[in-house]
Swiss-Prot record:
Keywords: Coiled coil, Cytoplasmic vesicle, Disease variant, Membrane, Phosphoprotein, Synapse, Synaptosome, Transmembrane, Transmembrane helix. The keyword Acyltransferase does not apply. The keyword Transmembrane applies. The chain crosses the membrane at residues 97-116. The lineage of its organism: Eukaryota, Metazoa, Chordata, Craniata, Vertebrata. It comes from Mus musculus (Mouse). GO terms for biological process: regulation of synaptic vesicle fusion to presynaptic active zone membrane; SNARE complex assembly; synaptic vesicle priming. Highly expressed in the zona incerta and rostral periolivary region of the brain. Other neuroanatomical regions show negligible expression. Expressed in the retina, expression observed in the outer segments of the photoreceptors, in the outer and inner plexiform layers, and in a subset of ganglion cells. Residues 117-118 are vesicular. This is Vesicle-associated membrane protein 1. Belongs to the synaptobrevin family. It is linked to Defects in Vamp1 are the cause of lethal-wasting (lew) phenotype, a mice mutant strain. The lew mutant phenotype is inherited in an autosomal recessive manner and manifests with neurological signs. Lew animals are characterized by a general lack of movement and wasting, eventually leading to death before weaning. The affected animals die near postnatal day 15 (P15). By P10, the mutants are noticeably immobile and lay on their side. Before this stage, mutants can be identified by a failure to attempt to right themselves. CDD domains: R-SNARE_VAMP2. Residues 1-96 are cytoplasmic.
Length: 118
């Protein structure tokens, strides 16, 4: 920061030290600084608006993603239960086939034994 402006000596209002051309009055300098600060504030406000918009968009996308994840989880649970039912169904079907195969083998063995021992 620059040093604070000192009031001009009497009779030298607006005059530069050393008798040169007059400089801008202190009021103009403060107005210029005020305008620069106001421009910076407006720039920061614009940036913050953009950031808030981005945050809101991100929040919306996250909400949509959360909804999709919930739907996917529900679908996965349904798939898991139907897969377990299907597995159990085919296990019983396999057991029935093994029992039938064993019965057929037993009948064949009985027929062979009866045929050769009679």
């Amino acid at each position: 920061m620059s040093a604070p402006a000192q009031p001009p000596a009497e009779g030298t209002e607006g005059a530069a030290p050393g008798g040169g051309p007059p400089g801008p009055p202190p009021n103009m300098t403060s107005n210029r600084r005020l305008q620069q600060t106001q421009a910076q504030v407006e720039e920061v406000v614009d940036i913050m608006r953009v950031n808030v918009d981005k945050v809101l968009e991100r929040d919306q996308k996250l909400s949509e993603l959360d909804d999709r994840a919930d739907a996917l989880q529900a679908g996965a649970s349904q798939f898991e239960s139907s897969a377990a039912k299907l597995k159990r169904k085919y296990w019983w079907k396999n057991c029935k086939m093994m029992i039938m195969l064993g019965a057929i083998c037993a009948i064949i063995v009985v027929v062979i034994v009866i045929y050769f021992f009679t």
